[in-house]
Amino acid sequence: MDLAMPGTPRAKELPNATNPEQLFAAGYSACFDGALQHIARQEHVKFESQVTASVSFLKDEVDQGFKIAVTLQVKGQGVEKEKLEVLVHKAHDFCPYSKATRGNIEVTLEVVE
């Protein structure tokens, strides 16, 4: 796997390289989907889910550096939206990535159709 920071000479040499934010998004979305399905099984709810994580790179006003924020978009097929919203919030409490980032980065949960 090629890794390169956007805007660097290495990124120009390896235009298909991934970056740390993409890796974080991939890991978080996969982990969250697993947590969501775990919670659903506990509640005897079966449905197809898809989780997409979008990572934003933001200015950190505290130290003038940078920070990230994440939006998790969750789609569920075969489950009512209201029930999915409840499951998503429970999954957010359970997910290891959510636990690790809680209080450190802004995470937005979106249930989409």
Predicted regions and their residues:
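Extended beta-strand/beta-hairpin segments
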Residues: 1-26, 33-113
